[in-house]
Amino acid sequence: MATEHAPTASEYVVHHLTHLNSTGHAQTSIVDFSVINVDSMFYSVLLGLLTVFLLWLAARKATAGVPGRFQGFVELLVEMVADQAKGIIHSAESRKFVAPLALTVFVWIFLMNAMDMLPVDLLPRIWEGVYASAGGDPHHAYMRVVPTADLSATLGMSCGVLLLCLYYNVKIKGVSGWVHELFTAPFGSHPLLYPINFAMQIIEFVAKTVSHGMRLFGNMYAGELIFILIALLGSTATVFGFVGHIVAGSIWAIFHILIITLQAFIFMMLTLVYIGQAHEGH
């Protein structure tokens, strides 16, 4: 009976790449704005609360004496983000908000990326058990645990950065100054160039926002998929499969630590760069 219901390799991969969403069944269309990925929302909020707690704990434990390991690490992280923010955003007033925001973004995205380090089947199996105990079909108990491997989540964050850029454009340059820039940059203030300038500005905003979210999503989705494929080696019930699963999984996990850290840093840096550009005129 166990082998009768055992999923094929393709079914295993598809199952692990399917979200728990608001409809209660697998999404069939590529784009459907009526669908909410509940798993991504849950883990994003949960890890966001964990981020706030960790930063609050670090601030609470801060002392003037010799710092402990945790405090020393947090101070090093804060100084790194503050230095990056100071080099990109020259307004001290803006940095009071943007620098803590960048630190929060880095820690939050790092924690979301780090969910990829958990065993592939750990949380999904637990969810299957809960779902089955509630009377549901465990074969339809979907659960993805890496929010940053969900394009809707990463684009949502990049859209948040876009809104901040628009806010600082208006705050720093004024409404009239920003509108003037929209129609006169980058090719000049000749009336015939107004439509071209405006189109170029819109393309720039859209391209930065889409690439900002896509870069994080693409790297984390690929990393998640590789972990799933490595997990398949362990199901082959052969010595080669078992050894390959252990060796490949260990090597990829070590390398993936660099990826999850680097992607969090890149997203944070691009956030600073885009907000910094809003402070500058063309």
From Swiss-Prot:
Keywords: ATP synthesis, Cell inner membrane, Cell membrane, CF(0), Hydrogen ion transport, Ion transport, Membrane, Transmembrane, Transmembrane helix, Transport. Gene3D superfamilies: ATP synthase, F0 complex, subunit A (1.20.120.220). It comes from the Bacteria. The keyword Ion transport applies. One of its GO terms (molecular function) is proton-transporting ATP synthase activity, rotational mechanism. The chain crosses the membrane at residues 38-58, 97-117, 145-165, 187-207, 225-247, 261-281. GO terms for cellular component: plasma membrane; proton-transporting ATP synthase complex. PROSITE patterns: ATPASE_A. The keyword Transmembrane applies. Pfam families: ATP-synt_A. GO terms for biological process: proton motive force-driven plasma membrane ATP synthesis. Signal peptide: none annotated. It is found in: Cell inner membrane. SUPFAM superfamilies: F1F0 ATP synthase subunit A. It is a multi-pass membrane protein. Belongs to the ATPase A chain family. F-type ATPases have 2 components, CF(1) - the catalytic core - and CF(0) - the membrane proton channel. CF(1) has five subunits: alpha(3), beta(3), gamma(1), delta(1), epsilon(1). CF(0) has three main subunits: a(1), b(2) and c(9-12). The alpha and beta chains form an alternating ring which encloses part of the gamma chain. CF(1) is attached to CF(0) by a central stalk formed by the gamma and epsilon chains, while a peripheral stalk is formed by the delta and b chains. Key component of the proton channel; it plays a direct role in the translocation of protons across the membrane. This is ATP synthase subunit a. The gene is atpB.
